[in-house]
Amino acid sequence: MNSLIKENMRMMVVMEGSVNGYQFKCTGEGDGNPYMGTQTMRIKVVEGGPLPFAFDILATSFMYGSKTFIKHTKGIPDFFKQSFPEGFTWERVTRYEDGGVFTVMQDTSLEDGCLVYHAKVTGVNFPSNGAVMQKKTKGWEPNTEMLYPADGGLRGYSQMALNVDGGGYLSCSFETTYRSKKTVENFKMPGFHFVDHRLERLEESDKEMFVVQHEHAVAKFCDLPSKLGRL
């Protein structure tokens, strides 16, 4: 247990960027229990609102990127909590099946006992008649991220699905590289493992100008038994 990371932690976030050339900025604040893997965040669009695209494509960069709030089961070293007080960064490319591409660069730091996130995002090639630009998405299904050590950090891959108005899904693939600001020689790296995520929107108002979302995340090994004794 990292003494700098308490059982209840506050967080603050500033996100800015563009989607199909449209500029915007969001801020958020929240709290949660990093050791139980639960967190709640309240997010406001402070520039460029109401957004002309679905807020859902931003949602995963607020909380699916809030990696300090993951419960790690026994035997899995916590790469993210070990990174403090220096913190960590991550870069992600999300490719949607309709051709849209969403890239994120995020920095996580610890300031006066509060986790502070700065995110730069860029979305391109989202079809004007697609679910994202028509704002016809209805939230993310739960998913599992696959993680393993790579290039001195962690590499994450996952397939995700957005619910769409009228039934059906818009699927996408995530590829994320996580890097600690601390040299990896100073802590224990995890091996191959998975993280289950459930990201839910609890509240929204004013045409998605204000959103409250909650996430529960747990790191684990494969649940299936191995004949070779592997985890």
Curated annotation (Swiss-Prot):
Q: Which residues cross the membrane?
A: none
| Positions where (E)-2,3-didehydrotyrosine occurs in the chain | 64
Q: Source organism's superkingdom?
A: Eukaryota
Keyword annotations? Chromophore, Luminescence, Photoprotein
Q: Which cysteine-cysteine pairs are annotated as disulfide bonds in the entry?
A: none
Crosslink site(s) for 2-iminomethyl-5-imidazolinone (Met-Gly)?
63-65
Recount the PTM note. Contains a chromophore consisting of modified amino acid residues. The chromophore is formed by autocatalytic backbone condensation between Xaa-N and Gly-(N+2), oxidation of Tyr-(N+1) to didehydrotyrosine, and formation of a double bond to the alpha-amino nitrogen of residue Xaa-N. Maturation of the chromophore requires nothing other than molecular oxygen.
Per the record's keyword annotation, is Nucleotide-binding included, yes or no?
no
Gene Ontology BP terms: bioluminescence
The UniProt entry, under Pfam families, shows: GFP (PF01353)
Q: Which SUPFAM superfamilies match?
A: GFP-like
Q: To what use is this protein put?
A: Fluorescent proteins have become a useful and ubiquitous tool for making chimeric proteins, where they function as a fluorescent protein tag. Typically they tolerate N- and C-terminal fusion to a broad variety of proteins. They have been expressed in most known cell types and are used as a noninvasive fluorescent marker in living cells and organisms. They enable a wide range of applications where they have functioned as a cell lineage tracer, reporter of gene expression, or as a measure of protein-protein interactions.
State whether keyword Hydrolase applies: no
Instruction: Write out the function statement from the record.
Output: Pigment protein.
- Quote additional remarks: The emission does not change over the pH range of 4 to 10. Maturation occurs via a green intermediate and is complete within 12 hours. Recombinant expression at high temperatures induces oligomerization.
* Protein family membership: Belongs to the GFP family.
Could you give the subunit structure recorded for this chain?
Answer: Monomer.
Q: What is this protein called?
A: Red fluorescent protein eqFP611
